[in-house]
Amino acid sequence: MKELSSVSNPIVKAAAELKQKKYRTEQQAFLVEGMRSVEEAVNCGIVKQLFVLKGTKTASARQAAIIAAAAAEGAELYEVTEPVMKKIVDTETPQALTAVVARQSAALEELAAAGGIVLVLDRIGDPGNLGTMIRTADAAGISGVVLLAGCTDIFAPKAVRSTMGSLLHIPVAEGICEADFISWARKNGYEIAVTCLENADSLYQTDLQGPVAVVVGSE
């Protein structure tokens, strides 16, 4: 495992750039932080680089196993100092593991193949809220998520943290325009249910047996 101690190291700078959407798009990668989420990424086989906080390699058997699994998959491993880890992530107290992960995005047709209920998010602006909604959808057994154009970037660090790993195993189609979504829903026999506050049926009295696309609007 190579040691990195300089915040000016090109590898460190490239990873730190992933805090910005422009570079996430250019590199087709994003950051995943924390043992649980990094473990999910390793299990998915999509970790490109793994940064380990210096002095924590053997902090627990679980962490050691994650590092070993990442190495076996061919990920680049780096042991970094705390200043370097702080440079890479956007939190004041960085966790022991941070990974650069290959960006994954589903196509609408992949969601159609799964059937069931699809959650459609429209212009969700807060990264934390977006991540929480994806995590909730995953826990509820939703088959996939559609992010309409105008939603904040799901690969932003705060959004990724809020998903707590769910982003890595629930299909998410991003940047979909409304017209394409409606055309796709009609083509694949989806009933569209839109949430609202007034003059609406109760969620608990509504038949949501698939295929149904539930649209939730902005904050």
Task: Describe each PLM feature range.
Residues I67-A69, Q95-L97, S162-S166, E191, ...:
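Short, hinge-like loop/turn segments at secondary-structure boundaries
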Residues G34, L121, V216-G217:
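Hydrophobic residues in beta-strands of the RecA-like P-loop NTPase core, especially within AAA+ ATPase
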Residues I46, P83, A106, E110-A200:
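RNA substrate-binding interface of SAM-dependent RNA methyltransferases
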Residues E92-A113:
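Acidic/glycine-rich phosphate/pyrophosphate-binding loops and surrounding catalytic core
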Residues A193-E219:
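Active-site/ligand-binding-proximal alpha/beta "capping" segment
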Residues M1-D90:
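N-terminal positively charged helical leader segments and presequences
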